[in-house]
Amino acid sequence: MLKIVLAPDPVLRIVCDPLAQVDSHHQKLIKEMFETMYEANGVGLAAPQVGINKRIFIIDTGAREEIKNPIAMINPIITNIKKTTSIYEEGCLSFPSHYAELERPDEITVEYVDENNKKQKLVTKDFTSRVIQHELDHINGILFIDHLSRLKRDVIIRKMKKYKKEINKSDEK
């Protein structure tokens, strides 16, 4: 299983490189990313969150939305954004136990390549749209806390630094 990179970490700030072609190595990575995401009880995971500088993310919103199957998105691009927005609470596997309310567009159209090198187009809304936007932010070096006020962002970063110190101490034992 892959290790999830915890914030703050500079690897989470890198704008990821596109993939020219999905090969068996990338398909194995995608499979391992799904295993890691499920183990952490997540609904999305981006390659930089496991230390990989590639424009790949996975989502599985399950029965919560119109998309019933897990999806891997490679080199995704949002091609249309509806003007209506909603505010919902978001979390992130790189920020365990930290949540914040964010405003995001309700509906998007995203084009991407799947794990079989097939071009895909998806129109999605609500929760799935939000998850895709969150993961797309990750591969662009943007974190969900970047959408918050400076004060809220600084509080979460301080708590994460403390959390990482505690984890490192327990790992040393």
Where do the protein language model's features map onto the residues?
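Positively charged
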Residues: 1-173
